[in-house]
Regions:
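Hydrophobic transmembrane alpha-helices and their immediate loop junctions
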Residues: 1-234
Length: 234
């Protein structure tokens, strides 16, 4: 059991770190390409996970969820967390309005691309299965499946139209100015709203589970599409 837990924790941690790191790095690379070097000047245009770690969102909360689920139900059914946001100065972008839309979209876009790429990688692991240890093959396929799942969930969650999530910033960029200002004004409360919806209200209202609904009704259909796009049947 201990060995299985170690393998499961390693697969979960690596999949989550890759998804979060590349998501944040994509924002930084996009901002730099579009004229804003703020993130680059702060060392955030980087593939080094340490530069994107948030103590609570990347370490403490995911660790608590991971350990509590393994100890209570013996498996991991849900994870939640966040990285340190990449700083972007929209006024340094060559086109502040549409530049911010593209910078915000870069994070979810890289997650969708990674999900598809891991789906393709599964073919390679399967083809090499006879020359790999059985445990190694199983672990790699588990890691690939988790990577696809986490990347799709991270992308779908971040596309929710609520600042400071990417979807909210995209919405601000495409709405007419009066509506954009109203939506942008929600950003100061955005994290509190998300925490309330994901953690607080589900404990107070029976059957209220917006994160579960997002996963079931949006992320899992997208995941199935990614599997098909990667050539894993219909």
């Amino acid at each position: 059991m201990t060995g299985e837990w170690v393998g499961e924790i390693a697969a979960i941690a690596l999949a989550a770190i890759l998804a979060i790191t590349l998501h944040e790095a994509a924002h930084g690379f996009a901002a730099k390409a579009l004229g804003d070097s703020t993130a680059a000047e702060m060392g955030r245009v980087s593939l080094n996970p340490i530069r994107h770690i948030d103590l609570v969102g990347t370490i403490l909360l995911p660790a608590f969820l991971l350990v509590s689920q393994l100890l209570t139900i013996g498996r991991v059914e849900a994870m939640f967390g966040w990285a340190k946001p990449v700083p972007v100065n929209i006024w340094r972008l060559r086109n502040p309005r549409w530049g911010m839309v593209l910078v915000a979209a870069a994070g979810p876009a890289i997650n969708f691309a990674l999900a598809w790429g891991f789906g393709l990688a599964a073919h390679g692991v399967t083809a090499l299965a006879d020359s790999l240890p059985e445990d190694g093959t199983e672990w790699l396929l588990r890691f690939i499946a988790l990577s696809m799942l986490y990347n799709v969930i991270l992308a779908c969650f971040n596309l929710l139209p609520l600042p400071p999530l990417d979807g909210g910033r995209i919405l601000v960029g495409i709405l007419p100015a009066p509506l954009a200002r109203a939506v942008a004004g929600l950003e100061r409360f955005g994290l509190l709203i998300v925490i309330g919806l994901v953690f607080v209200l589900p404990h107070l209202i029976t059957g209220f589970d917006p994160l579960g609904a997002l996963i079931r009704n949006v992320a899992l259909p997208v995941l199935r599409f990614m599997f098909m796009l990667a050539g894993h049947g219909g």
